Amino acid sequence: MSDILHTTIIGAGLAGCEAALWLAGQGVHVTLYEQKPAHFSPAHKNAGFAELICSNSLKAERLDSASGLLKEEMRRMGSSLLPAAEAVRVAAGGALAVDRDAFSARVTALVEAQPNITVRRGRPPPSTSPSRCWSPPAP
Protein backbone atom coordinates (compact mmCIF):
# COMPACT_ATOMS: atom_id res chain seq x y z
CA MET A 1 0.00 0.00 0.00
CA SER A 2 1.25 3.45 -0.89
CA ASP A 3 2.00 6.05 1.77
CA ILE A 4 0.62 8.74 -0.53
CA LEU A 5 -2.83 9.83 0.55
CA HIS A 6 -5.43 10.32 -2.15
CA THR A 7 -9.03 11.45 -2.10
CA THR A 8 -11.72 12.17 -4.65
CA ILE A 9 -13.99 15.21 -4.41
CA ILE A 10 -17.09 15.46 -6.54
CA GLY A 11 -18.06 19.01 -7.42
CA ALA A 12 -15.93 22.13 -7.86
CA GLY A 13 -18.30 24.47 -6.05
CA LEU A 14 -17.28 26.53 -3.03
CA ALA A 15 -16.99 23.59 -0.63
CA GLY A 16 -15.36 21.25 -3.15
CA CYS A 17 -12.71 23.81 -4.13
CA GLU A 18 -12.00 24.86 -0.55
CA ALA A 19 -11.64 21.21 0.51
CA ALA A 20 -9.48 20.31 -2.49
CA LEU A 21 -7.13 23.26 -1.98
CA TRP A 22 -6.80 22.65 1.76
CA LEU A 23 -6.16 18.91 1.38
CA ALA A 24 -3.71 19.46 -1.49
CA GLY A 25 -1.85 21.98 0.66
CA GLN A 26 -1.48 19.26 3.30
CA GLY A 27 0.12 16.92 0.75
CA VAL A 28 -2.96 14.88 -0.12
CA HIS A 29 -3.38 14.04 -3.80
CA VAL A 30 -6.87 15.08 -4.89
CA THR A 31 -8.93 14.12 -7.91
CA LEU A 32 -11.59 16.80 -8.34
CA TYR A 33 -14.54 16.04 -10.61
CA GLU A 34 -16.60 18.85 -12.11
CA GLN A 35 -19.50 18.14 -14.44
CA LYS A 36 -19.24 21.47 -16.28
CA PRO A 37 -18.88 22.22 -19.17
CA ALA A 38 -20.54 18.99 -20.35
CA HIS A 39 -23.48 19.39 -17.95
CA PHE A 40 -24.87 22.60 -16.46
CA SER A 41 -27.52 23.12 -13.81
CA PRO A 42 -30.22 25.67 -14.70
CA ALA A 43 -28.56 28.20 -12.36
CA HIS A 44 -25.05 28.13 -13.84
CA LYS A 45 -23.74 29.84 -16.96
CA ASN A 46 -19.95 29.48 -17.12
CA ALA A 47 -17.58 26.54 -16.97
CA GLY A 48 -15.49 27.95 -14.12
CA PHE A 49 -15.28 26.61 -10.58
CA ALA A 50 -17.02 28.06 -7.50
CA GLU A 51 -19.57 29.86 -9.64
CA LEU A 52 -21.83 31.96 -7.44
CA ILE A 53 -25.48 32.55 -8.30
CA CYS A 54 -25.57 36.10 -6.84
CA SER A 55 -22.76 38.60 -6.38
CA ASN A 56 -23.56 38.78 -2.65
CA SER A 57 -23.85 35.01 -2.10
CA LEU A 58 -21.06 35.21 0.49
CA LYS A 59 -23.35 37.41 2.61
CA ALA A 60 -22.68 39.61 5.65
CA GLU A 61 -19.26 40.13 7.20
CA ARG A 62 -20.43 41.17 10.69
CA LEU A 63 -19.22 38.78 13.38
CA ASP A 64 -22.66 38.85 15.01
CA SER A 65 -24.11 37.10 11.93
CA ALA A 66 -23.75 33.41 11.16
CA SER A 67 -22.21 34.08 7.75
CA GLY A 68 -19.76 36.63 9.16
CA LEU A 69 -18.68 34.30 11.93
CA LEU A 70 -18.22 31.44 9.46
CA LYS A 71 -16.01 33.61 7.25
CA GLU A 72 -13.88 34.60 10.25
CA GLU A 73 -13.46 30.93 11.18
CA MET A 74 -12.51 30.16 7.58
CA ARG A 75 -9.90 32.95 7.60
CA ARG A 76 -8.36 31.59 10.79
CA MET A 77 -8.19 28.12 9.27
CA GLY A 78 -6.38 29.37 6.17
CA SER A 79 -9.18 29.57 3.61
CA SER A 80 -8.00 29.85 0.02
CA LEU A 81 -11.33 31.13 -1.26
CA LEU A 82 -11.77 34.16 1.00
CA PRO A 83 -8.60 35.92 -0.22
CA ALA A 84 -9.78 35.19 -3.78
CA ALA A 85 -13.15 36.77 -2.96
CA GLU A 86 -11.58 39.79 -1.30
CA ALA A 87 -9.40 40.38 -4.36
CA VAL A 88 -12.47 40.75 -6.61
CA ARG A 89 -14.94 42.31 -4.18
CA VAL A 90 -17.45 44.93 -5.26
CA ALA A 91 -19.22 47.51 -3.11
CA ALA A 92 -22.20 46.04 -1.25
CA GLY A 93 -22.45 47.69 2.15
CA GLY A 94 -21.76 45.15 4.88
CA ALA A 95 -21.73 42.11 2.60
CA LEU A 96 -18.82 40.38 0.93
CA ALA A 97 -20.00 40.73 -2.67
CA VAL A 98 -17.80 39.80 -5.60
CA ASP A 99 -17.58 40.05 -9.35
CA ARG A 100 -18.90 36.53 -9.95
CA ASP A 101 -17.03 35.83 -13.18
CA ALA A 102 -13.74 37.18 -11.82
CA PHE A 103 -14.15 35.15 -8.61
CA SER A 104 -14.86 31.95 -10.54
CA ALA A 105 -11.87 32.57 -12.83
CA ARG A 106 -9.59 33.23 -9.85
CA VAL A 107 -10.70 30.07 -8.01
CA THR A 108 -10.40 27.99 -11.18
CA ALA A 109 -6.83 29.26 -11.67
CA LEU A 110 -5.93 28.48 -8.03
CA VAL A 111 -7.23 24.92 -8.32
CA GLU A 112 -5.65 24.25 -11.71
CA ALA A 113 -2.27 25.59 -10.51
CA GLN A 114 -2.14 23.28 -7.47
CA PRO A 115 0.11 20.33 -8.42
CA ASN A 116 -1.59 17.93 -6.00
CA ILE A 117 -4.99 18.42 -7.66
CA THR A 118 -6.01 16.55 -10.79
CA VAL A 119 -9.14 18.01 -12.37
CA ARG A 120 -11.45 15.68 -14.25
CA ARG A 121 -14.14 17.38 -16.33
CA GLY A 122 -17.35 15.39 -16.55
CA ARG A 123 -19.25 13.18 -14.18
CA PRO A 124 -17.31 10.58 -12.21
CA PRO A 125 -17.63 6.94 -13.22
CA PRO A 126 -19.96 4.79 -11.13
CA SER A 127 -18.16 3.28 -8.17
CA THR A 128 -17.44 -0.41 -8.41
CA SER A 129 -16.15 -0.78 -4.87
CA PRO A 130 -17.49 0.32 -1.50
CA SER A 131 -16.40 3.66 -0.12
CA ARG A 132 -13.31 3.61 2.04
CA CYS A 133 -12.79 5.93 4.94
CA TRP A 134 -9.36 6.96 6.10
CA SER A 135 -8.51 7.53 9.73
CA PRO A 136 -5.17 8.72 11.06
CA PRO A 137 -3.08 6.05 12.75
CA ALA A 138 -3.42 5.78 16.50
CA PRO A 139 -0.61 7.54 18.42
Q: Each predicted region: which residue ranges?
A:
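Short, contiguous strand/loop micro-motifs
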Residues: 6-7, 57-58, 94-95
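N-terminal FAD cofactor-binding segment of flavoenzymes
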Residues: 21-83
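General structural feature for long, well-ordered alpha-helical segments within catalytic domains
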Residues: 15, 19, 70, 103-107
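Short, well-ordered coil/turn elements that cap or connect secondary structure elements
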Residues: 2, 25-27, 114, 129
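N-terminal Rossmann-like FAD-binding beta1-loop-alpha1 element of flavoenzymes
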Residues: 5-31
